[in-house]
Amino acid sequence: MPIEEQTRNSGNRRFVRSSRALAGEFLCLIALVALMGSVGTPYAEAQTDRKPPSRAAKPELPKEKQTTLGLYVTAKEAYEKWKAAPKKATVLDVRTPEEVLFVGHAAMAWNVPLFLQTYVWDAERGKFPMKPNPDFISQVKKIAKPGDTLLVMCRSGGRSAMAVNQLAEAGFKRVFNITDGMEGDLVDDPDSVYRGQRMKNGWKNSGLPWTYAPTPDRMMLPKIR
């Protein structure tokens, strides 16, 4: 056989062997990818099956300000949320009518008191106690539906948390607690001249719009019994 033909045949055999080797490597790669995919699937499924953490608990908040729905905003965040879509969000002030009139209120807010002020002095507790408003839920339902967004405030976030929980039990799903309320938290710095006063945060201290002017068309006043 001529030398040139021997060389050509030898080259062809090397090409065939090389092609077979590449094909074998490609098949091994496919098998490896498939194996990795099958091993990863249970992990992915486990990740998918994991339940998201509960939003109800917010460790940095005092327990009395936490709610079952776990939806929280500051006064400033609540105002921005309302301002962005005033027809889709309702600001709900659950303080007493007396607080609304004498302390001031956000003009866009509806006043539906969670508690009503009494005028019988409790000597043991050292205050005029409040009593629950029996019409609270029915009054809220006159201005909002269970699917509406409600931004709930009181003086400093405690009563509003209670209101959120009651509304949640009544079927409302998007109810946010305004955690610093209208007046804010007490200053606890022993060196501050404002110690013991509500000068820390809250709607008024955040520079948000408020007024003393009554808005009786937005107040659910208690029935005289």
Residue ranges with predicted function:
Residues M1-A21:
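N-terminal secretory signal peptides that target proteins for export/translocation
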Residues P2, L35, P42-K87, L101-T149, ...:
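Rhodanese-like catalytic fold shared by cysteine-dependent sulfurtransferases
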Residues G24-S38:
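Bacterial N-terminal signal peptides
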Residues T90-R95:
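Short hydrophobic beta-strand that contains or immediately precedes a catalytic carboxylate
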Residues M153:
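Short, surface-exposed ligand- or partner-binding patches at beta-edge/loop junctions that are enriched
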Residues G157:
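Conserved G/P- and acidic residue-centered "switch" motifs that form tight phosphate/ATP-binding loops
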